[in-house]
Amino acid sequence: MFGALIKKIVGSKNERELRRLWPIVEQINHLEAEISSLSDDQLRNKTTEFKERYARGETLDSLLPEAFAVCREAGKRVLGMRHFDVQLIGGMVLHQGKIAEMKTGEGKTLVATLPSYLNALTGRGVHVITVNDYLARRDSEWMGRIHSFLGLSVGVIIHGLDDDERREAYNADITYGTNNEFGFDYLRDNMKFSLDDYVQRDFHYSIVDEVDSILIDEARTPLIISGPTEDSTDKYYIIDRIIPLLKKGEVLEEEANTLSGKRKRYTGDFTVDEKSKSATLTEEGVLKVEKLLKVDNLYDPRNMETLHHVNQALRAHALFKLDVDYVVKEGEVLIVDEFTGRLMPGRRWSDGLHQAIEAKEGVKIENENQTLATITFQNYFRMYEKLSGMTGTADTEAEEFHKIYKLDVVVIPTNRVLLRPDFPDVIYKTEGEKFNAVIEEIRELHAKGQPVLVGTISIEKSEVLSELLKRQGIPHNVLNAKQHEREAEIVAQGGRKGMITIATNMAGRGTDILLGGNADAMAKQWRRGNPEASDGEYERVLAQFKEQCANEHDEVVKLGGLHILGTERHESRRIDNQLRGRSGRQGDPGSSRFYLSLQDDLLRIFGSERVAKIMDMLKIEEGEAITHGLITKAIENAQRKVEAHNFEIRKHLIEYDDVMNKQREVIYAQRREILAGEGIRESFLDMVDETVADLAAGYAIDKVPAQEWDWQGMGDSIYKIFGFQVDIPAETMERLNPFNLRELLQEKVRELYTAKVAEFGDELMDHLIKVIMLQSIDTQWKDHLLSIDHLKEGIGLRGYGQKDPKQEYKKEAYQLFMDMMLRTREEVVEKIFWVQIAREEDVEKMEEQQKRQRLVFNLGDEPEAQQPVTSKKVGRNEPCPCGSGKKYKQCCGK
């Protein structure tokens, strides 16, 4: 109560933040008359003036009012669009490194030009991240006109560009692109053999559009670059044939006299847990699979790979559905993005799951790939010095943004009052009853001409609904992953009179639905059909379309605007809000309502028992609908339960992934140092000395006479690595101790190294060391990633041994990393001392062979996430980031 009183007096945190920014808005408005009086050249010269003032020490914050005023004026002159006051506030929030929540239709794309322009004045680059190539290209061409007018360069990163084109785009003042392309470019750069081949530069400032989709929805999906393995694909077909012979069972609970109270019992051959998306063999199932595959023991270490593929095949059949999770197009399995409904060509599930689904669908199986490089979006975006984001729906996840990413959410007020009523949910007992009611409402609204946007959560459901509408003779458009190419065109006309649009998911569609239709889109479509038409004809047709759309707009407004009809609740309230947000933009009228059934996935998995009890209590008959506060509350509780469950998973995974991320930073930093050629020979000699020291320490035992040391073992190890025989006279051996043995060996090894340098020459030797170091690091890192994957798969079982899996994972991942570093060092030293080169071309051939790898770009199935920290170079006296507790110079920085 006291907190509520304080809030009433001083306002909420969001209100206080907005109050703090309004005086700056007034400053910008005060400058408008002065700035608008400038000529185009004078306005453009302001950019040069700002850059000079920044170079002299003025801060971006002090330049902000003038810079925003200049950018606003450029928008008016170039696009005929003036930034509203609330858009200026949105721009300030983004500049501060926060998330701006702006409702659909409030002009997020235009808002981004303000902080982009201001931060580009530093000359260090600004990255504007969008969710697909279409939006990246559109925004770079559309909003890029403002920046180009003001003298800044604009680039765009989309699929299909070569390295030179990418480098040019990254070197621009402002670069637009997709999150996937930016992430993969980072991984590709860190696999290259020359710094000159890198395309990206420093990570200065990033504005992420649909930030909730990227930092929350895709939090557990790593980007993976992989190379093919040589394994046969026959095993996938063999295992796939036995899966239909297995019977799905269920988990039963029976009373037991144990401390836990109840004991689980399983029926059938396997059980499915839809919450965790897992399928598990029962004891009977294991015996049946062993018999079918003619395997003695599925859990024998030699058969663990077979067990893994059986589990993935189970998941493929029991949990992944055609036209929901993926589609089959032209003999290829294509993933459907569950958050946006888009197809993701070129992306594959990892760890054998994609191959299992290919076997299930009877299409050609592509070889399984081995991970060469991987990163999550969180780990990529946390490298930016300043990160900001925009979305229409972030407030429901404000706590997670703050706790995990230290990003505050500021809700920006709308330019005009929202007039959209959101009607209570209508619930039916069965899906069939629900669809009948949906069709009836669509028919009524269509009869009076009101446009309707129907939201579904899968391609399968959208096609069922489309078929029902066809039977009723109701014309409509379907917008799902299968119609990706027509997406913008369909969305643009979704607000025309009588238009019915079915959409799988509206997240990130990027095109506003204008009541009455979009005249520009209609004119462009006309131009595609009339390519020979003159500019004059085009302008005349555009004017006609504008008049037609304006008249239709007034009619649609009288009919109540765009009606949103949701056919199922998503697991996240935010996705539901994104669908609702397509209506009521910029003060337009609109409405929304969700139709649900007890057979919907959300209610069936997470909340049906409570809802069913309420419906029974209220004596709801079959075919009868209910709209009741208790039901709506129960549904919201189910959604909160799912959101909390997913939040806990992401938070938990962050702690796991932090270990891997620190190790990656160490490896990539080492690669960069090698590529830069800084002290490469000194680094190699340090490796040599450490290898000798380890050998001496391993065989020469203090307080044990030298004659009793394991000279045979020492000699074999020295010969294996350095290629010479240990020959120490008896009188010298008597005087040896571990310290002077090390000195003796180091002296001999240095002599051999000097002879190698004399044989090859300084330049060739340095080049050889560089190539072998990179080869060894890349090979060992690739194997380490595989080891980490295997460790991650089995670490959960440690809980049964009363051990904390998280701590066990950190400890073992650290040990694996240190073992990898040791193997890398020994491999480099051994190769250099044994290598024989006839010509310099041999070294270049080694380098070229390493470069020639067929790479595959995947979205991983393994969940990962990460807490952001500021990335910086590790000092030699700072603690090592691998977690050993040692100084960097004494650990991974050796």
From Swiss-Prot:
Listed InterPro entries: Helicase_ATP-bd, Helicase_C-like, P-loop_NTPase, SEC_C_motif, SecA, SecA_CS, SecA_DEAD, SecA_motor_DEAD
UniProt-listed Pfam families: P-loop_SecA, SEC-C, SecA_DEAD, SecA_PP_bind, SecA_SW
Cofactor note: May bind 1 zinc ion per subunit.
Main localization category: membrane
Membrane topology annotation: Peripheral membrane protein
GO MF assignments: ATP binding; metal ion binding; protein-exporting ATPase activity
Keyword ATP-binding: yes
A GO cellular component annotation in the UniProt record: cytosol
PROSITE patterns named in the record: SECA, SECA_MOTOR_DEAD
Record field: catalytic activity: ATP + H2O + cellular proteinSide 1 = ADP + phosphate + cellular proteinSide 2
PANTHER family: CHLOROPLAST PROTEIN-TRANSPORTING ATPASE, SECA INNER MEMBRANE COMPONENT OF SEC PROTEIN SECRETION SYSTEM
Primary role: Part of the Sec protein translocase complex. Interacts with the SecYEG preprotein conducting channel. Has a central role in coupling the hydrolysis of ATP to the transfer of proteins into and across the cell membrane, serving as an ATP-driven molecular motor driving the stepwise translocation of polypeptide chains across the membrane.
UniProt-recorded name of the protein: Protein translocase subunit SecA
Source organism (scientific name): Geotalea uraniireducens (strain Rf4) (Geobacter uraniireducens)
